[in-house]
């Protein structure tokens, strides 16, 4: 059965983007899972709308000691649950979803995604989940990569999808299994249907390192999965006989969790060095097979989360800065990891004026992929990036204003001038996309301020 190592929870999360808690790690009486499952079966059979008012026992899972311990580590103490939309159970059936990242709301707001663990999704399975029961399908290690989310108008949530034509062409509405499927049981069991093939090819075409589909199975009854809000995933069809579906339904509850506090982060010249040269026992992927770009990303996020450090002050000579600049400006969606990795690599050497200047140049670049990578790199620099983000908010380009606004929320100095700037953008910017980011940026700034010595003054 699948489960994570509690002693390496942060390590697993910043690399894989997902951790799994066994029923023992969750820490409630196993009988509770059976009670929830039986109640849910009855409500489902009676076609009731299922929520916590129908099954109040689900709240005991949210209060479980193992869940609290894991969430405290990943998104900080006093984390909260989004009290509306999508906190609901799902039943697995005959259809496949396309690969997607859940919407970053409000719908089509085209907001940048937080690379730091601010949003978390929690999945709870009251029953065991075997490989034929429609296990949730994920793409581990995909949480830091995406596509142009500014000018792509082909879908409802920016471009956080793989092969959105799968949806547009109607394949998501075609049953893969069950009595209305046109596939044979052999095709379904061997995962050789047109749906299976196309969904696998969508992953392969990214050409991103370590990227392979991973079905979250087998799971014991009462397992909890915590994964990054940025992880590509999809709902999956059942592969067993249709007669089993009603007898043994597969339920999954989903909750959106978010960070409400954030400890002050410092620059550190001697951060905790953690090794990524190992086999991921969950996915069986060899992490040492990756390039330096992934390690730069993982190093940053491990130290941010586990050691409260913003950057790793590594000395960068001119040759290294030049190499990273070339990677930051490289073309092609397949090179997304190189651009993002280069940005974090430059951030780690931002004590070098040359490295910082490359990130500033990238922020003002016309290409969205470079600008986005540079934004994350400058966020990795910390408060030192305040002035360049302030400058970006005055641009004639709404997309650059959006990047600057996002950056101020993430790392802008907790100073009145930053609050005033974000407030002005919220009230006066001509772009709804920028105003949306400004509203969230004020919340991000408040999240940082409440944990600092300046909290009373700033609030």
Located regions from the model:
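Structural detector for internal amphipathic alpha-helices that build alpha-solenoid repeat scaffolds
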Residues: 298-319, 337-352, 369-384, 391, ...
